[in-house]
Structure formats: C-alpha cells, structure tokens
Amino acid sequence: VVRLVGSEMCIRDSYIIVSDVLSEKLQKKLSPKGRMFYDSKWFINYFRLTPDGRMLWGGRNNLSTDLDLEESASILSRQVRTVFPDLEKTTFTHTWTGKLGITFDLMPHIGEINGIHYTFGYGGHGLSIATYLGTEIGLLLSGQKKRSPFEEIAHQTMFFYKKDPWFLPFAAKYYQFLDWIS
C-alpha cells in the first residue's frame, strides 16, 4: 500500500493565518451570513469567520515543501488584504501549516491490497471526505455495501514521478501564470 500511495500522490503543504477578533460590524460586512468561501484560483484560497469572530484565511500559495511559516504568513496576509481591504490594519495572530496528499487526478481513492483497506488523496478536503470514505470502507468491510464508486476511479501516476517531485516548481509557475491571466 505504501508503494502504491507513494507513486500516486504528492505531499504538499497548506497554510493558514487567523486574525485578531474583528468588530461585529466588520464581521457582518465581510461575511453577512458567516459562510465558508473558496475562490476559483489554481492556488486556491479559502476563508471564513471563526465562531469567536476572527478571519481565518488559508491556501496553498506555492508547491514548495520548505516555505518558511513566517514567509507564508506574509504572503497570505497580503492576499487577504487584497481581497478584503478593510483588513489592512488587522493583526494576524496565528499561523500554521499542514500536509496534504494530492493525487494526480485530484480525486480521493479507496481500495484493498492483500486484505489491507486504504483511502488516500484528499487534496485538502480531508475532514469531510475522510469521514465519508471511512464510512464507505466500514460498510464494505461489514458487507452492508458491495462496491463504492470511489473504488472505480482508476489510479493514476505519471511516468516521470518516482517519489521525487522535481517537476513541482515548473507546475507552480504554470499555475501562477494561469491565476495571473484569469
């Protein structure tokens, strides 16, 4: 299973910053209904207000595995202030990063090899899709379900990928270009 996953998935970082508590007036202006948002960029950004009234802004601003956390926070704070100029003077007090498993087809996969059941490749949607796919595997194991549509998704790899993602700097520049022209 480890060999399979290693040849079909790249591990990347995603980053988050969180602001100080915002005034109720500013909260209502930024997100009147308190919803979660995603943009449509290749280097996607996502944001929402936290239950205690802070702005949470996250994204993958490059494909590096060694971006400094402070540098990432600086990039993200510029991005959020571009989208929300009202946050120009807002202080961002928290930042962190986490690992993502991204498959070449950008789809999660489940399956079984030699009696070992697996699921991987959530690509940044881990909490919701992992819960769902865990339930799928549980139903398959208990016999309550015969097949899952996720088992039907063909596993993809690239002939040039041997666990060394040497191509990612080129892909990052390409995605940055696509974001720039759109």
Sequence positions of predicted segments:
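Single conserved hydrophobic/aromatic residue that forms the stacking wall/gate
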Residues: 1-6, 10-11
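Short Gly/Pro-enriched turn/cap motifs at secondary-structure boundaries
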Residues: 7-8, 35-39, 98-100
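Small-molecule pocket liners
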Residues: 13-15, 45
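Active-site beta-strand termini and strand-to-loop segments that position acidic
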Residues: 19, 49-50, 111-113
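Conserved FAD-binding catalytic core of PHBH/FMO-like flavoproteins
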Residues: 22-55
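Short beta-strands and strand-loop turn motifs
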Residues: 57-60
